[in-house]
UniProtKB/Swiss-Prot annotation:
It holds the Pfam family tRNA-synt_1c_C2. Its EC number is 6.1.1.18. ATP binds at residues 34-36, 40-46, 229, 259-260, 267-269. PROSITE patterns: AA_TRNA_LIGASE_I. A motif ('KMSKS' region) lies at residues 266-270. The gene is glnS. This is Glutamine--tRNA ligase.
Length: 556
């Protein structure tokens, strides 16, 4: 699907009108992550939106790091975010850091002080919260609100020069403590933080608040359309106030859209961190995580994520997207690209008693039956093979076409075999089958034309390559993420989200490279886990099942 879906028209219409009216000559968008964690599928929606709009309107897009909170930020996150954006298939026009503008932001703060639009306040964080009031009760003015300009300037200089402790003073905007919008009740613009910054070191001990820094960053960079999620809608009056009162010529426009919400998925950074810290997963790139790193390790393709984000579009109305929709686009991508191979997840040994001992032959099997250009591979076959345990039943129900005593099945691209005996252990479990084969059925068809309903995949015992195979289910059982349930959400963590089995794959798979993807015949799509496959030991992650009943909603 392309980018021109109806649900994103409201943003495009705004941009079109802005260009027509001459308000802006060129479109500049930005993706502005804070480098304090890893990107997730919700960020991917914003990335695709901003880069696609810039591309459609022949504009530019900035990758900007909102690095104004040194205690939580790290170069590690900067590099991982850059890698994720590139992996998704995008190249930014300008790489920017909020910290590069600290001097200019300080100058704008001084400008507001001299205009009488900002003041230094000595109230504690708790007192500021108390003075702010509520949605139904107006706030009350700080006792420090009417300090004169000279005193405010000297105190702010002192804050900058390290004369005060963390939390001892803040710089606040002087707006309206009775405003119905709580964000306009003298918000904090600067706070003291004696913390080393990943980019500026120890040069600064005061740092701008997000609501002050963000509009300034957009204006400084010449951003025209600052696209963000709906939780910032109530912050837009403050965004516009900062631009206006700082008297900046460039006037970016903030536009809000609904954030991505998905079934069986949490995207709160706090909740994701809790999953990592409490060892529900093995890191931020765990294949069950909705992070870009996790999706990548799981085997998702950049194209499938881009197509998903385009298909869901953007709107003002919040909604829940079925997580199966993401799987739909992934499956659609892998169906075309992934080579086919056979893998046995729960091995049951089969001895073909009338097959010559010591003989090995090979069968040519297509890598993709829908794409002749994918070529063929040679697969060895001999007297002993593995099939899946679930492909045999001693006492099957009606219309069971797989293997059972006396029944004949087709081995994919090989021979017909018939079960003659089931060998059991002392507990009565079937541990081995005895079968005979029909030499005339070579290639999987019999010259006498007899029909065989069941076709089984198999692997030659002598050349089988051991593999650990990881089968994933949704990490979160709750359909919808609920705000403010930081602890309760753990009650919905799926204890069976990972199942590990020891199986076998074809001999050619020993040469597989990290992140290569395959369709395991009848099992689904799998990828080699490059992080865990070491010293010749292969680990495969199931990316997604072969089929699903999910269909794209008509309005998409």
């Amino acid at each position: 699907m392309g980018d021109n879906n109806n649900s994103s028209n409201f943003i495009k219409n705004i941009i079109i009108e802005d260009l027509k009216s001459g308000e802006y000559e060129k479109v500049v968008t930005r993706f502005p992550p804070e480098p304090n964690g890893y990107l997730h599928i919700g960020h991917a929606k914003s990335i695709v939106l901003n880069f696609s709009l810039a591309d459609e309107f022949e504009g530019k897009v900035n990758l900007r790091f909102d690095d104004t909170n040194p205690s939580k930020e790290d170069v590690e996150y900067v590099e991982s975010i850059k890698e994720d954006v590139k992996w998704l298939g995008y190249n930014w026009d300008n790489l920017c850091f909020a910290s590069s503008y600290f001097e200019r932001m300080y100058e704008y703060a001084v400008f507001l002080i001299k205009k009488g639009k900002a003041y230094v306040c000595d109230l504690t964080a708790d007192e500021i919260r108390e003075y702010r009031g509520t949605l139904t009760k107006p706030g009350k003015e700080s006792p420090y609100r009417n300090r004169d300009v000279e005193e405010n300037f000297k105190l702010f200089e002192g804050m900058k020069n390290g004369e005060f402790k963390d939390g001892e003073k803040v710089l606040r905007a002087k707006i309206d403590m009775a405003s119905p919008n709580i964000n306009m009740r003298d918000p904090v613009l600067y706070r003291i933080a004696h913390a080393s910054h990943h980019n500026t070191g120890d040069r600064w001990c005061i740092y701008p608040m997000y609501d002050f820094a963000h509009p300034l960053e957009d204006a400084i960079e010449g951003v025209t359309h600052s696209i963000c999620t709906l939780e910032f809608e109530d912050h837009r009056p403050l965004y516009d106030w900062i631009i206006q009162e700082c008297e900046i010529e460039n006037r970016p426009k903030q536009i809000e859209f609904a954030r991505l919400n998905m079934t069986n998925t949490v995207m709160s950074k706090r909740k994701l961190k809790q999953l990592v810290d409490e060892n529900f997963v093995d890191g931020w790139d765990d294949p069950r995580m909705p992070t870009i790193a996790g999706l990548r390790r799981r085997g998702f393709t950049p194209e499938s994520i881009r197509n998903f984000c385009r298909a869901i579009g953007v709107s003002k109305a919040s909604s829940i997207v079925d997580s199966q929709m993401l799987d739909y686009f992934l499956r659609d991508d892998l169906e075309k690209e992934a080579p086919r191979t056979m893998a046995i997840l729960n091995p049951l040994k089969v001895v073909i008693t009338n097959y010559p001992e010591g003989k090995t032959e090979t069968f040519k099997i297509e890598n993709n039956p829908d794409d002749a250009s994918a070529g063929v591979r040679e697969v060895p076959f001999s007297r002993e093979i593995y099939i899946e345990q679930e492909d045999f039943m001693e006492n099957p129900p009606k219309k069971y076409y797989r293997l059972f005593p006396g029944n004949e099945v087709r081995l994919k691209s090989a021979y017909f075999i018939k079960c003659t005996e089931a060998i059991k252990d002392k507990d009565g479990n079937v541990i081995e089958l005895r079968c005979t084969y029909d030499p005339a059925s070579k290639g999987g068809n019999s010259p006498d034309g007899r029909k065989v309903r069941g076709t089984l995949h198999w692997i030659n015992v002598d050349t089988a390559i051991p593999a650990e195979i990881r089968l994933y289910e949704p990490l979160i059982l709750e359909q919808q993420e609920k705000e403010g349930e930081e602890d309760l959400f753990l009650d919905h963590v799926n204890p069976n989200s990972l199942k590990v089995v020891k199986g076998f794959v074809e001999p050619d798979m020993k040469h597989v490279k990290s992140d290569e993807k395959f369709q395991f015949f009848r099992h689904g799509y799998f990828v080699l886990d490059g992080k865990c496959s070491k010293n010749g030991e292969l680990v495969f992650n199931r990316i997604v099942s072969l089929k699903s009943s999910f269909k794209i909603p008509e309005n998409k």
